[in-house]
């Protein structure tokens, strides 16, 4: 479900809450940051640009494979979506795993979120590189609820579940210490 549809469903009472990339401000909806994850470069073995660490200026759009919307960074100076307007490799649907296979077969590189790193094989993990710069190479994930929502216990159950599989260093400090307070 796209973020705007999710927010509409929250406002209409069709769903209680939703999780999406932060920055989807809407009147009547509260946003609670949950965790922040970094992005990494995933390179094909044949990629000529095997730098140990990447800077945004090293990421040329010609060889980049991106998904239609999933890798966009809202309000960022370094947007993976800029390549879309240049007519390069834009993968229309699927998953990060499929995108990695496309890179492995066709060359080039893509951007993958930190939460996907544990799913890589040892060989694939060798093709991952860091991107320098905190703001430019990360995204914040938030929980969205209607502003009059009162089920604090349910929200804390969601937060507690996330704490079990999201590394503590990625979780928001307030969520870790205090949980969600309405």
How should these model regions be labeled?
Residues 1-2, 21-22, 67, 86-98:
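Short beta-strand-to-loop elements that line the ligand-binding cleft
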Residues 17-22, 43-45, 66-68:
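Short beta-strand elements of ligand-binding domains
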Residues 62-84, 114, 151-160, 169-176:
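Secondary-structure junction motif
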Residues 49, 73, 129-171:
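A late-sequence structural motif
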Residues 26-33, 37, 51, 98-147:
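Beta-alpha-beta core module
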Residues 1, 15-21, 94, 111-113, ...:
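Short beta-strand and adjacent tight-turn residues that come in two discontinuous sequence segments
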Residues 2-39, 52, 128-129:
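Short beta-strand-centered segments that line the small-molecule binding cleft or hinge
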Residues 4, 46, 71, 97, ...:
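Alpha-helix/helix-capping structural signal
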């Amino acid at each position: 479900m796209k973020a705007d549809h999710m927010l509409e469903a929250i406002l209409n009472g069709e769903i209680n809450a939703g999780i999406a990339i932060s920055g989807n401000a809407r009147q009547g909806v509260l946003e609670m940051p949950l965790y922040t994850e970094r992005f990494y470069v995933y390179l094909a073995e044949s990629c000529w640009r095997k730098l140990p660490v990447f800077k945004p200026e090293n990421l040329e759009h010609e060889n980049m494979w991106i998904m239609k919307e999933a890798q966009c960074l809202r309000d960022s100076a370094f947007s993976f979506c800029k390549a879309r307007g240049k007519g390069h490799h834009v993968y229309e649907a699927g998953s990060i795993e499929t995108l990695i296979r496309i890179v492995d077969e066709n060359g080039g590189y893509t951007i993958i979120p930190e939460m996907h790193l544990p799913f890589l094989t040892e060989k694939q993990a060798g093709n991952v590189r860091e991107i320098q710069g905190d703001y430019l190479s990360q995204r914040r994930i938030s929980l969205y609820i209607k502003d009059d929502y009162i089920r604090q216990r349910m929200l804390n159950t969601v937060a507690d579940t996330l704490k079990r599989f999201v590394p503590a260093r990625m979780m928001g400090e307030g969520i870790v210490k205090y949980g969600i307070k309405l």
